[in-house]
Structure formats: C-alpha cells, structure tokens
Amino acid sequence: MADVSVLINGYGTIGKRVADAVDAQRDMEVLGVVKTSPDYLARLAVEEYGYPLFVPEDRVERFEDAGIETEGTVEDVVLNAEDYGLDVVVDCTPEGIGARNKETLYEKAGVKAIFQGGEEAEVAEVSFVAQCNYEEALGADYVRCVSCNTTALCRTLGTLKEEFELGRVYVTIVRRAADPHQVKKGPINAIAPNPVTVPSHHGPDVKTVMPDIDITTAAVKVPTTLMHMHVVRVELKEEVTSDDVIDAFEEARRIWVVPHGEGLGSTAELIELGRDLGRKRYDLYEILVWEESINVEDGVLYYMQAVHQEADVVPENVDAIRAMTELEEDPEASMDATDSALGVLNSPPL
C-alpha cells in the first residue's frame, strides 16, 4: 500500500496528467478522480485507467444515465476523508472554484489541498516551485502550484539566481491562445495584449515564489495552441559569459538547452520532439531554452524559452504532495523520485 492517498478534484488538462503522475509514483496512490460532466474523459478514467470516479451530489443522476460507474460523491469522500483514507486533494478545477472548494470542503474536513496557478496566492500558505522553495511547503496544509508561465520563469531565473548576482529582469510572454482541445477560445486571427496593462500579473506571481527578484513582465496572446514562449532580458551585476549561462542551465533540473539549428526552430518542432520521444500526450515537463538565443552583451543576458503549458506544472504537484505530507524532506530526493517515475530528463537526448 502506498504511503499517501490522493484525490484529484478536476480531471481536465492538468488533472488527468496529475492523476497519471501520482499513479506512477511508488509512495503515493490515486484514491480517485472527480468529474462534473459524464464525457469521454470520465469514461476513460474509469474504463481505461481504472480510476475510482467521484462526482458532485447534484450530478449523480447524469452519470447514471450515461452508464458511467461512480464510487460516490466528492462531498462524501472529502468530508469523510478519514474513513476513505484520504490524505491530500489536488484541486485542478477551473479558476476560482478551488478557493470555493477550500471554504466548503477542505477546511471543513481538515484535509490538505493543493491548488493550481489560476487561484489567487492568498488561497494557500505557500506558492510553490520545487527547485526554489520546497522546504517552505514542508507540513503545509495548503499549497498553490503556480501557473505554467510562473513555473517556467522560476525554474530558469531561480537557476540563474543561484549562480549569479542578478539585477532587473524584463520578460515578454508570448502566450498560446488556447489549449489544443479548446474550441471556444481565441484569438484565431489576431495578436492581443493579455493583459493590456503593463506590467502584467506574471511578475508579481514570480515574486510569490522568489520575493527578492526584481522582475517586470508584459504578455500577448497569439493564435497558436502548442506552447508559450518567453523572451527574457536579465541585467547582470557581475561578469558572466554566455557559456557560463549555458553551463548553469545544462546542470539544472527540468531545463533543456536545445539547438535551434537541429530542426528545433519553433514550438511546433519542439512538440514534435515530444512525440518522437514517445512522451504520453507529447508532454514536455522540461523548460526548453534555445541555445542560440543565450547571449550576454554589455552586461545584459538575453534568452528565449518555450513552455509546454499543459505539462510543466505536473512534476511540481507531485513534489508538493511529498512536501506537504513530509514523505520526503529533501527536495533533491523528492525531485529524483518524481523525475524518475515520469521520465523527466535534465538534458535532451540529442
């Protein structure tokens, strides 16, 4: 029997990946997943992956009518957590619903919960990126795994901050318009400020993890579904070469330095790399930095990185479970276990 039992509340883009990631670990298990709609994902969860399925009380009849087997209600499993052996809920519900679930379910039941980056930072005691502040989440009741963009920036900037003295950071975020399965979002023929205000919210979100970094961000949305891209400018307070930066990234966890010149010149080709590596759902958990973009000029570092928005936060959720339950106090040991189970690599197999 696994050491920790986990309920994934919300089985969509992130939730289904977190469920599979938890299921792959030796020291934790999936107690169940929660769905609100009796769709193909719910059917796959039960019939293909064998996950116990829980649903809201007011949706039970819909699942019965659809012929999808359920194990009970989400209200019952959370509010009777001890009876079910539930240790942690990973809340992967849409923005704002997690905070409501905390108030109506998790706090009432005294159950630990992890939230995603769409929630406000105030929902949790800690905003979390394993490489940056794992120890802060040890024993915490509520943790927020920050957004895909924030996670990516924390990984690369955190690596740089460990090695070099940094000044101001400026980032332009080029956001994908929607995930591949989403048909109700856009734009499909425009570039849109998102948000139109500068600075954007991404910089302050990075500071919830790395409070002493000086960062300003701006963001736009473009008509693509595959990945985000960041153009990063970092003022340096010491002499650093491009090779120093490449070495730092290559030594870091969950960051790949990839060669633009070997047919990896776009986000489409990076996603194809994920497919060719045999990754499930072509997931790229790692942040991919183009080697040729890394340049230091007049005391300023520039680089570009690509972010698979569906996947990069998944390892963080697993590490957060270990930290909160104190399964593992050493961040490196937790990340070793997570990465081994998921096939996360610290350098591309190129």
Curated annotation (Swiss-Prot):
Pathway involvement? Carbohydrate degradation; glycolysis; pyruvate from D-glyceraldehyde 3-phosphate: step 1/5
Question: Where in or outside the cell is it found?
Answer: Cytoplasm
Q: Where is this region: Disordered?
A: 327-350
The main location is cytoplasm
Active site residues of this protein: 148
Pfam families cross-referenced by the UniProt entry: Gp_dh_C, Gp_dh_N
Does Cell membrane count among this protein's keywords?
no
According to its record, what are the GO cellular component terms? cytoplasm
**List of residues binding D-glyceraldehyde 3-phosphate:** 147-149, 202-203
State the CDD domains in the record.
GAPDH_II_C (cd18127), GAPDH_II_N (cd02278)
Q: Keywords on this record? A: Cytoplasm, Glycolysis, NAD, NADP, Oxidoreductase
Q: What HAMAP family does the record point to? A: G3P_dehdrog_arch
Q: Name the protein family.
A: Belongs to the glyceraldehyde-3-phosphate dehydrogenase family.
Supply the name of the protein.
Answer: Glyceraldehyde-3-phosphate dehydrogenase
The organism named in the record is Methanopyrus kandleri (strain AV19 / DSM 6324 / JCM 9639 / NBRC 100938)
